[in-house]
């Protein structure tokens, strides 16, 4: 299940969730790879430990070529929407060293389906990304080009019956 989380993160954000360029000392490449992907693995977007954010070390002279994907202030994992954000945190923070905490494949599937429902087409026809995930704010704009969304957004609130005569919002 870890590989599925990594693939989804890489596919959507064009970077590896654990390869941030953390320095482990003077060791050979194989040992460094084992630490980076194993016992010392650290999510590049960990909320309290930013020691794995040395993208210059990871990408070298190609750092600029891979922007905005190497700029976490412009493309944080949170731009993937609330459903995937939660699962990335579960997979790469809570479950990184505790496999039982990782989301199931079915949970990923449901989150991807729900996220697809939040997809909006950018109002800027020149935007390289073309689409972005609605972030449920009044000032909806594309996180990639900064263009304000020019259309109205129909919003449906779904409720489920929590217990008899008690209804709660689904999201």
Residue spans for each PLM region:
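Conserved C-lobe activation region of Hanks-type protein kinase-like domains
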Residues: 1-2, 7-85
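Activation segment of ePK-like protein kinases, specifically the conserved APE
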Residues: 16-17, 96-99
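Regulatory extensions appended to serine/threonine kinase catalytic cores
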Residues: 79, 83-90, 98-171
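Carbohydrate-binding surfaces of carbohydrate-active enzymes
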Residues: 93
